[in-house]
């Protein structure tokens, strides 16, 4: 089935999604399964970057992910600690994999790393004990550190470091129009959160504890320019606060959290945030 045919079938099924159930067979199930398989292999992705830097969201692929929850029934998923099991609709990406399959895939998955089927992991990536949700795309030589979450359909570029405990938001709940996008060579500091379709542009650095949503103000300390929904290329961002409006009694009001661009990436920053190739051999 061609991509155009897949898109047409999936869009039609999504419009009539109330009729799609675990009993649905035929063209709709085949189209959704095929789309998820393509996502799993990295042959298609939920969002794609054009030469001019603009990202296009393939909404039909996001719809395929959503439809899979209506098509698939709950089942036992083995592999829990102490021979325990899980109960879910989405199998592990690694179900049935052997040594040869992992060698061909070319990435590292440390015990405790959970990746759901339809997420793509590129060569030389490293997955510490973490969670990568369905439809996500993790590109080459990226490190997903311990206790990180990569949300549904999130797009992570090459040579990205997502530090311990950081969260990259998904698109499924609450439903978002576009996924979070982390472009190449970015550094996401420990315990930071990027959600609601925010785009972190190439080479940007978020320090520890930066929280970014679609409405978070990102203030350039040098120019006063305010960004929302997008971190500029090579920006170094730290947590900050904006002064609040005075209260009715004239006293200072509570401040509002923001993010602050303190500088652009320089050699000193690169030396602190560069990836270690030894970990990716």
UniProtKB/Swiss-Prot annotation:
<keyword id="KW-0220">Diaminopimelate biosynthesis</keyword>
<comment type="pathway">
    <text>Amino-acid biosynthesis; L-lysine biosynthesis via DAP pathway; LL-2,6-diaminopimelate from (S)-tetrahydrodipicolinate (succinylase route): step 1/3.</text>
</comment>
<dbReference type="Pfam" id="PF14805">
    <property type="entry name" value="THDPS_N_2"/>
</dbReference>
<protein>
    <recommendedName>
        <fullName>2,3,4,5-tetrahydropyridine-2,6-dicarboxylate N-succinyltransferase</fullName>
        <ecNumber>2.3.1.117</ecNumber>
    </recommendedName>
</protein>
<dbReference type="GO" id="GO:0016779">
    <property type="term" value="F:nucleotidyltransferase activity"/>
</dbReference>
<keyword id="KW-0808">Transferase</keyword>
<keyword id="KW-0457">Lysine biosynthesis</keyword>
<dbReference type="GO" id="GO:0005737">
    <property type="term" value="C:cytoplasm"/>
</dbReference>
<keyword id="KW-0677">Repeat</keyword>
<feature type="binding site">
    <location>
        <position position="145"/>
    </location>
    <ligand>
        <name>substrate</name>
    </ligand>
</feature>
<dbReference type="InterPro" id="IPR023180">
    <property type="entry name" value="THP_succinylTrfase_dom1"/>
</dbReference>
<dbReference type="Pfam" id="PF14602">
    <property type="entry name" value="Hexapep_2"/>
</dbReference>
<dbReference type="GO" id="GO:0009089">
    <property type="term" value="P:lysine biosynthetic process via diaminopimelate"/>
</dbReference>
<dbReference type="InterPro" id="IPR005664">
    <property type="entry name" value="DapD_Trfase_Hexpep_rpt_fam"/>
</dbReference>
<dbReference type="InterPro" id="IPR001451">
    <property type="entry name" value="Hexapep"/>
</dbReference>
<dbReference type="GO" id="GO:0019877">
    <property type="term" value="P:diaminopimelate biosynthetic process"/>
</dbReference>
<dbReference type="GO" id="GO:0008666">
    <property type="term" value="F:2,3,4,5-tetrahydropyridine-2,6-dicarboxylate N-succinyltransferase activity"/>
</dbReference>
<dbReference type="InterPro" id="IPR037133">
    <property type="entry name" value="THP_succinylTrfase_N_sf"/>
</dbReference>
<keyword id="KW-0028">Amino-acid biosynthesis</keyword>
<comment type="subunit">
    <text>Homotrimer.</text>
</comment>
<keyword id="KW-0012">Acyltransferase</keyword>
<dbReference type="InterPro" id="IPR011004">
    <property type="entry name" value="Trimer_LpxA-like_sf"/>
</dbReference>
<feature type="binding site">
    <location>
        <position position="108"/>
    </location>
    <ligand>
        <name>substrate</name>
    </ligand>
</feature>
<comment type="similarity">
    <text>Belongs to the transferase hexapeptide repeat family.</text>
</comment>
<keyword id="KW-0963">Cytoplasm</keyword>
């Amino acid at each position: 089935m061609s991509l155009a045919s897949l898109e047409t079938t999936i869009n039609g099924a999504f419009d009539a999604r109330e009729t799609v159930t675990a009993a649905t067979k035929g063209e709709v199930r085949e189209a959704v399964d095929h789309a998820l398989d393509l996502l799993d292999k990295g042959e298609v992705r939920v969002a794609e970057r054009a030469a001019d830097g603009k990202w296009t969201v393939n909404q039909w692929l996001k719809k395929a992910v959503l439809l899979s929850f209506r098509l698939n029934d709950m089942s036992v998923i083995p592999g829990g600690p102490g021979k325990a099991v899980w109960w879910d609709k989405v199998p592990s990406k690694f179900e049935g994999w052997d040594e040869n399959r992992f060698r061909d895939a070319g990435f590292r998955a440390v015990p405790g790393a959970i990746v759901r089927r339809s997420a793509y992991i590129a060569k030389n990536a490293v997955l510490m004990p973490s969670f990568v949700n369905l439809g996500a795309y993790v590109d080459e030589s990226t490190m997903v550190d311990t206790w990180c979450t990569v949300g549904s359909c999130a797009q992570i570029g090459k040579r990205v470091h997502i530090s311990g405990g950081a969260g990259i938001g998904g698109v499924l709940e609450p439903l978002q129009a576009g996924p979070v996008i982390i472009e190449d060579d970015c550094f996401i500091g420990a315990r930071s959160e990027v959600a609601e379709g925010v785009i972190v542009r190439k080479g940007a650095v978020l320090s520890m504890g930066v929280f970014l949503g679609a409405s978070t103000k990102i203030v350039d300390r040098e120019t006063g320019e305010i960004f929302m929904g997008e971190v500029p290329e090579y920006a170094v961002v730290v947590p900050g606060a904006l002064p609040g409006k005075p209260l009715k009694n004239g006293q200072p009001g509570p401040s509002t959290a923001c993010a602050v661009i303190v500088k652009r990436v320089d050699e000193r920053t690169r030396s602190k945030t560069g990836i270690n190739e030894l970990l990716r051999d």
